[in-house]
Amino acid sequence: MDNKISTYSPAFSIVSWIALVGGIVTYLLGLWNAEMQLNEKGYYFAVLVLGLFSAASYQKTVRDKYEGIPTTSIYYMTCLTVFIISVALLMVGLWNATLLLSEKGFYGLAFFLSLFGAVAVQKNIRDAGINPPKETQVTQEEYSE
């Protein structure tokens, strides 16, 4: 696979961070202001943390496989399974919650925005490491001479 072209875009990186932080803050503010028991808030918080970790870990595993970095199938399948479980837990929790439909949609959108942000930020961090900005490349070339 010689067609591994990864580009780093500062604009996309900034938007990714905004999506990640915005999704997490929105989700947590919704939990903070929600009129639900503390154990329910803990459930939704744990689902968010599980989803963020599994999404970033799954993206990294897929990227490692694409770049030819050895990964085990068991870890790949574990990441995928945990990601699916986190989404299913949120869906089941919202389905059974005594919330308004608009509140359920709010939590769902904030959750998926956070997952997108986590994957995009992780991708951008990795791309920045592979293709550093040109100023950094010039500096490294000067030191190697």
Swiss-Prot record:
It is found in: Cell inner membrane. Residues 33-41, 95-98 are periplasmic. The chain crosses the membrane at residues 13-32, 42-59, 72-94, 99-121. Pfam families: YiaAB. Keywords: Cell inner membrane, Cell membrane, Membrane, Transmembrane, Transmembrane helix. GO terms for cellular component: plasma membrane. It is a multi-pass membrane protein. Residues 1-12, 60-71, 122-145 are cytoplasmic. One of its GO terms (biological process) is DNA damage response. Its main location: membrane. PANTHER family: INNER MEMBRANE PROTEIN YIAA, INNER MEMBRANE PROTEIN YIAA-RELATED. This is Inner membrane protein YiaA. The gene is yiaA.
